[in-house]
Amino acid sequence: MEDSSNTIIPSPTDVGALANRINFQTRDAHNKINTFMGIKMAIAMRHGFIYRQGILAYYYVFDAIEQEIDRLLNDPVTEEELQTSTILKQFWLEDFRRSTQIYKDLKLLYSNTFKSTESLNEFLATFQKPPLLQQFINNIHENIHKEPCTILSYCHVLYLALFAGGKLIRSNLYRRLGLFPNFEKLSQKELVKKGTNFFTFSDLGPTEETRLKWEYKKNYELATRTELTEAQKLQIISVAEGIFDWNFNIVAEIGELNRRELMGKFSFKCITYLYEEWMFNKDSATRRALHTVMLLVLSIIAIWVLYFLVKSFLSIV
């Protein structure tokens, strides 16, 4: 967003701005996760159950972050928490809250499984989180309790990522309506709107979302410019670097858990999933491993076909 002097805050060339420093230090990790997430999103867009698992995982991630934001805003105790609370109040708006938005998406995505709000809430409260996801959630709470200022790492990396990619993801989802349960009374437009709240920051349209993004970036910079020590800024940057690794790991964990489950069932869904993993994955080692698995799967299919052909032939004879 531009101010009255027609200058963007922070300026892209402002090497002292905390946001720019985070971006510079995490540039390689950012490129790596972008490529990885692009592959995984392409696969998830073809399998609704995988997409739903990803949305569920990030519900818990953002819920953990926003629990800490609420605690720091409403009940700061230590001097460091009071300092962070003052900073948060300068840029945080309820429009940015994601956990309640993701919850709306989960109500739609799980509507065929949980017919009432109570049953969905019970599921969310008792769901056994995968190990790495649980570790990430624990790490969020531990980091912020130890160094309250590190909440600013999550505010920068995760929320700005949604601002940047939300519109693109909504567009892709519009072309993949098979991800959502069928509702006779909802049009395609209504279905996408009800299932993409996670990626939507305003119902007023893209212009308002762009304004909110620049407002967020501007106020984040103004709030952190002089309120933090250099040591605190370095700690925020360090935690920001780790967030990319955690994102990579929890998404990879979803893929690995699905691969194990589908291989155990050996179904058409298993074959299509493995094929798409092989098609979209550019990592040579991963491609070789998946190629080996695909050959094994095809060999098993060939043996089955041969078995039934021989059995049919012998029954005729």
Curated annotation (Swiss-Prot):
Membrane protein topology class: Single-pass type IV membrane protein
GO cellular component terms given for this protein: endoplasmic reticulum; endoplasmic reticulum membrane; membrane; nuclear outer membrane
Principal location listed in the UniProt entry: endoplasmic reticulum
Cytoplasmic side: 1-289
TM segment ranges: 290-310
SUPFAM superfamilies: Heme oxygenase-like (SSF48613)
Protein name: Heme-binding protein HMX1
Originating organism: Saccharomyces cerevisiae (strain ATCC 204508 / S288c)
